[in-house]
Structures are given as C-alpha cells and as structure tokens.
A protein has these predicted regions:
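Bacterial N-terminal signal peptides
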Residues: 14-25
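Boundary at the C-terminal end of the N-terminal hydrophobic targeting segment
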Residues: 25-33
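N-terminal secretory signal peptides that target proteins for export/translocation
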Residues: 1-10
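Substrate-binding cleft of extracellular glycoside hydrolase catalytic domains
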Residues: 88-196, 210-222
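N-terminal carbohydrate-binding/catalytic regions of secreted carbohydrate-active enzymes
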Residues: 33-133, 357-384, 400-401
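A solvent-exposed, charged loop/short amphipathic helix patch at secondary-structure junctions
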Residues: 156-172, 367-390
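Surface-exposed substrate-engagement region within the catalytic domains
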Residues: 46-58, 206-372
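Structural recognition of the beta-strand scaffold that forms the well-ordered cores
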Residues: 35-38, 69-72, 96-101, 138-144, ...
Length: 407
C-alpha cells in the first residue's frame, strides 16, 4: 500500500493522542510510538499453564502477541478491580490495553455466549465500575460485541423484525438496548484517555446504511468510532472497504441529512460475491458527496478498528444446504490468523488492527442445526464459548496469512 500524506497524518494524529495519554499518566520517558499491551496474565497464558505438548507450545506462542482482555461478568466492584489491574499494568509497561466490555443485558440473544447484566440499572452500575477501574489511564474500549448487530425485537430500516425475538419481551427491548449503549458511551466518554468503539458488525452482515443508523442512535458521535469483524473471519479486502463505507454513510447522514437507506452497500450497486465490483459502491459514495455538496473528510469522520485475529483465510463457505444452520461464524474449519495487531494501520479510515477475539478460544458448541453435542463439521464436541480449543489454535497458526515468521 502506498501511503498518502493524509494517511500518514491520520496515523500520526491517532498515535499522538495515545502518546499524550501515556505521557500524562506515566513518568517521563523517551517518546516512541505506543504499542499494544501484551498481558503476561492473559487468558491465553492461563490456558498454556493447563496444557502440555504441542498445545502448550501453541498457547505460549500466541500469548506473545497482544490480544484483548474481555470483561464479561461480575459485580461493579469486581469489574472495577479487574479493569484497574489491567490498565495499571499496561501503563507501567507504557503500552495500551484493549478492553472488551461484554455484559449488556440479554447478551447474544441467549445463544452460546448468553448472559449479561440482569437489567438496565445493573448494566449502568457495571459500566460505572468499569469506568472507575480505568480512571485517567489510557485504554481502548470495545463496547459490546454484537450490541448493535443482535438487538432484541429490533426493526430494520425497512420495518422488518430481526431474528432475536425473545418471549416475554417486546419492542421496548430494542429501545432499552439503545438506552443502555448511550448510557455506557456517556459514562466512558467522560474519561480523558479512553478511545471507545461501538459495534459496526461486518461486511457479511448489515448494509452500511443499516448499521450507520444504529450507530448514530447509539451516540457514536461521542465515541471514536466503531469496531468491525469481532469474532468473525472476513478478509481484509472485504472489511476495509466496508469500514470506509460505514464512515462515509455516517458523515452523509449526519452532515448532509441523507436517508441512511440511500447509502450504497456491498449488495448494491456492487455484487456481494464479486469484490472487483465494489468499486461501483466507491463511485456511488463519491457521487453522493458531490450531490450533497459535502467534502469527504476521513480525518474528521468516525473510524474503525478491525479484528484480524482469525481473518487470514477469510470466511468459511460450506456447501449450500449441507446444514440447517451452518453457523459459519462458529469455529469454522481451515481458518488462519490475520495481520498482527498494530496501532499503525496506514489507512485513513482505520485506527488499528487488533486481535479482539482471543485466537484459540472457542466460539461455542457449534451444533449447526443438529441436536449435538458434536460439531458435525469437526466431528468433536467443541469447548464452551471462551474456553481454549487447541485444535483451532493449531489451525490458526498453521494457516496464518501473512505467514508467521516463526513459531
């Protein structure tokens, strides 16, 4: 990739903000680009302690790279203590931690990662504990994976109900989800050295207009931007253009009054299957900026952070009709690590490439529409969500793209 002056300036602005945060919070030291926190007490390192042989070696190898710390349960006091411990150790190392807040009520629509706060009040208190734990120390906060992609009793822009429709709840559940996210953004954005990102789903999921409307309603204006591809597998050539389109769509809607349903997408005028056709969507955005007499300004628009922990081989496409529900996001076979985590993306729309999903940790049982308990694609009973899956860790390392220099 050839970097323009604007690209370089954009990266310098992002890094300067993090450097400033570190300088304010830490003793004086020589200025250098900040790095992401490599936690010696990560869940990957903990998994290595319980393993032996090749599985242990794989976990120790993966533990050398920075990955996110997931905060997904516990009382406000517990999450406060956990967050304080992580950000304090990161600050001492002059590194930037990535914290995943994953405790919103009715999380994951009661699927493999079910759980979360009991209600909106409990969630507000939990976020308050997280904020107290972070304090004035630098951190990147990934606020609620699937928080905007899977909303109970939510209607799309075309008025259709989505699939998450739990019994005993109604359309008020969707309004509560937005209230909870806006409340969390308000609390966390008051912290001086935190970069907050909201759920932006991915190019294999929602059209840019659909997710842009949700991000705007969730107060992305007060956040740094949105995260993409978390716990997913979309390749760089798909997810990076999508980041640009979501950012542009937000700008067109908020600055130009565009109806988000008019935002071009990976489905139109482009063809989803053919990424070569995606230049048609780029051109459509150019025309919209011209029509509304707006100047595209990536440096002032909302930016993405992208999860590259498992996207080296792209998404999995099983034969059509093989499974009643293929669950292509759930421990798919033959995937690989993607590009290494970095705060220097070289892209005007992307703040960082991160390993948000911890590579090597299971997505869940992955029954693919069967009665289980065996994953029919792998012919094994997969570990519960978040537990170490040694066979998958081995695949990710072997099939890494770009290839890893050494193991």
């Amino acid at each position: 990739m050839i970097l323009t002056r604007s690209d370089i300036g954009r990266a310098r602005t992002w890094i300067a903000a993090l450097l400033s945060s570190l300088a304010i919070c830490a003793p004086a030291a020589t200025a250098q680009a900040p790095s992401l926190f490599v936690d010696s007490r990560s869940t990957t390192a903990e998994a290595a302690d319980r393993l032996d042989g090749r599985a242990k070696d794989d976990a120790l190898f993966l533990a050398r790279f920075p990955s996110a710390s997931w905060l997904a349960y516990g009382s406000p006091d517990i999450v406060e203590a956990k967050a304080r411990d992580i950000v304090s150790r990161a600050l001492a190392a002059r590194q930037v931690p990535v914290l995943v807040a994953y405790n919103i009520s009715y999380r994951d629509c009661a699927l493999y990662s079910a759980g979360g706060a009991a209600d909106s009040g409990a969630y507000h208190d939990w976020i308050g504990g997280l904020a107290r734990g972070i304090g004035d120390r630098p951190a990147i906060v990934i606020l609620e994976p699937d928080g905007l992609g899977v909303i109970p009793w939510h209607r799309t822009l075309t008025g259709e109900f989505e699939g998450c429709r739990p019994e005993g709840q109604g359309e008020a559940a969707a309004a509560r989800r937005y209230e909870e996210l806006r409340g969390a953004v308000a609390i966390l954005s008051a912290l001086p050295n935190v970069h907050i990102y909201l759920d932006g789903t991915g190019s294999g999921w929602l059209a840019p207009g659909e997710i842009a409307a949700r991000l705007i309603r969730a107060d992305v204006a007060k956040a740094s931007g949105f995260f993409l591809n978390v716990s997913n597998f979309e390749s760089d050539d798909r997810i990076i253009p999508y980041a640009r389109w979501v950012s542009d769509c937000i700008a067109l809607v908020t600055r130009g009054g565009l109806d988000p349903r008019e935002c071009p997408s990976q489905f139109s005028p482009a063809s989803f299957e053919n990424t070569a056709s995606w230049t048609a969507t780029d051109a459509a955005y150019d025309r919209l900026f011209a029509r509304l007499r707006l100047t595209r300004a990536p440096e002032r628009q909302k930016h993405a952070v992208i999860d590259t922990s498992r996207n080296g081989q792209g998404s999995w496409y099983p034969p059509a009709g093989k499974y009643r529900d293929a669950e292509v996001w759930c421990n798919p076979p033959g995937r690989g690590l993607g590009r290494l985590p970095s705060l220097e993306s070289g892209n005007r729309y992307v703040d960082a490439f991160l390993w948000i999903k911890v590579p090597g940790e299971s997505d869940g049982a992955c029954l693919r529409g069967t009665a289980g308990p065996v994953d029919p694609e792998r012919s094994v009973e997969a570990p519960p969500a978040g537990q170490w899956f040694a066979a998958q860790a081995r695949e990710l390392i072997e099939l890494a793209n770009p290839p890893l220099a050494s193991e």
